[in-house]
Amino acid sequence: VGLVGSEMCIRDRSQLVFDSAVKKAYNNQRKINWMEVLAGQKAFDQQNDWLPDNTIEMFDKYGIGIKGPLTTPVGGGIRSINVSIRQKLDLYACVRPLRWFRGVETPTKRPGDVDIALFRENTEDVYSGKELEVNSDEVLALNKFLKSEFGWEIREDSGIGIKPISKTASERLIRAALNFAVENDKKNLAIVHKGNIMKFTEGAFRGWGYDLVKNEFSDVAISWQDCNGEPGNKILVQDVIADAFLQQVLIKPHEFDVIATTNLNGDYASDALAAQIGGIGISPGGNINYENGKSVFEATHGTAPKYAGQDKANPGSLILSGEMMFRYMGWNEAADFVIKAMEKSISEGNVTYDLARGRTDATTLSSSDFAKSLVENIESL
């Protein structure tokens, strides 16, 4: 398994938990051979390259990996390393399972109502990186072309970005979400979009989703329009405007099982949902190509450099991303041990500083001691 180095020690803490879960689950009959590959600050310091070609080559060769939070310099023309990894490996589905762990303080009244799998398209939309800088020769030329060919008037002092949404990318993302819903006995899937405004991009995403339901999933799924909200034993598929969704998922999250959405909407929605369950510190993520099997699982938060070297950062997101990785590999027994250990530590209040906030019954642990508590839980199960 490829392991991308993090700027924080949470990587080592997480690896300790992963190895313990595998040892417990399979009685030394299985083992992970870890291989470190570089990206982010460590790669730049050692190789003068934020994302070396060898890192992508190793992920491509071995097909699965897990990644800690990485630093990308703001500005300066350097693209997000996370986005670059996803696009270079064509990891088209960003999958975010969102659930609450009993004992975690949240701002909502019923965090336990959140049990949602969010599928976010990972390769297109405004994240495709097709942008032109204000006052550049390229943006002036494009402005001139758009005015002459389409009559579009765009202010001359504008930067311009392109928002591609393709049928190919939309269908494979929604197909992955539908397959997940089928395999996990989910009752509904919501296509979240802004097609009321962007009719030929996000509106097309919605339309292609409904077409896919009819053409490939009609035996197991049905649209709201075709059943008037009464799907019988099939998965109910409906669409929700993105801004309305952000309201509805706060008021009635129990009505949503699986979400399929575009890249930018998914970025907003996944972090908003994470806030409902206690924050991104316990929110895992995976970037997956279900067609060729390649995947990179990752912590969903940033590097928090102000806590570097303090043994303070919460490794929960990366550890739970490892649980996702195990389940994707078919190592469900190891995954179950990780989940049970996490549930026990959190419910007993043995947590890192961020999860201790607002709790009177919590014992604040360092990052390493939190990992040790998880290992002890695994060994006692």
Pin down the residues of each PLM region.
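N-terminal beta-loop-helix "entrance" segment that forms/cooperates
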Residues: Y26-P52
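Glycine-rich phosphate-binding loop
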Residues: I56-P73, E216-N292, I378
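Flexible, glycine/charged-enriched surface loops at secondary-structure junctions
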Residues: N27-N33, N184-H193, S218-Q238, W331-I339, ...
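Single conserved hydrophobic/aromatic residue that forms the stacking wall/gate
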Residues: V1-G5, I10
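N-terminal glycine-rich phosphate/adenylate-binding segment common to multiple enzyme folds
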Residues: A43-L146, G159, L264-Y268
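Active-site pocket-lining segments that scaffold enzyme catalytic pockets across diverse folds
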Residues: P164-S218, Q238, A242
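Glycine-rich phosphate/nucleotide-binding loop
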Residues: Q41-F44, L246-N350
